[in-house]
Amino acid sequence: MDYDKLKGVIEGLLFISGDEGIDAKEISEITEVTEEEVIDLIEDMKADFRRAGRGIQIVEVAKAYQLTTLPEHVPYFERLATSPGQSTLSQAALETLAIVAYKQPLTRSEIEEIRGVKCEKALNTLLSKQLIREAGRAEGIGRPILYATTKEFLEHFGLRELGDLPEPPVNLDIEEARLEASALFGKAEEATND
């Protein structure tokens, strides 16, 4: 694989690894180049990002590399987070919210087991919009956080109580459930945006 393609692959790996990051050893195993070459490539990418005036940077935290935004751009990100146009929820957030609404209280790992993918970003979005809350800690190893819906969730979706949620289908078809969640929560989003 040529040098530029390797840098592109590494950038993609950094992107999909998210907040957890990825260490040079794992990148080395995936790309089949030495750890030293990976470190050299990352240093070169850091310089490329600076030269090009990119809005992201590569940082090393606890021996793992991450893509992060530049600290000097924080005021713009704050504006985005508080702008009215950002009131809609992503499909991932809607799915996560539906799971919490029907199965609460439950842990992040239980949600991820149901969805089949990570849900940290969706949970953070829902927490920041105050649609879910931390509802204590589960018993067991590590005492993970339990999540439940909030009063704001009920208000946002025009529900008097959780019992007003439609009954989930017995034989759940995941694609059909996604469409129903979008329809239910999408209508409530439209009503609150009017």
Swiss-Prot record:
GO terms for biological process: cell division; chromosome separation; DNA replication. It is found in: Cytoplasm. Disulfide bonds: none annotated. InterPro entries: ScpB_csome_segregation, WH-like_DNA-bd_sf, WH_DNA-bd_sf. The keyword Oxidoreductase does not apply. Keywords: Cell cycle, Cell division, Chromosome partition, Cytoplasm. Participates in chromosomal partition during cell division. May act via the formation of a condensin-like complex containing Smc and ScpA that pull DNA away from mid-cell into both cell halves. PANTHER family: SEGREGATION AND CONDENSATION PROTEIN B. Homodimer. Homodimerization may be required to stabilize the binding of ScpA to the Smc head domains. Component of a cohesin-like complex composed of ScpA, ScpB and the Smc homodimer, in which ScpA and ScpB bind to the head domain of Smc. The presence of the three proteins is required for the association of the complex with DNA. Belongs to the ScpB family. This is Segregation and condensation protein B.
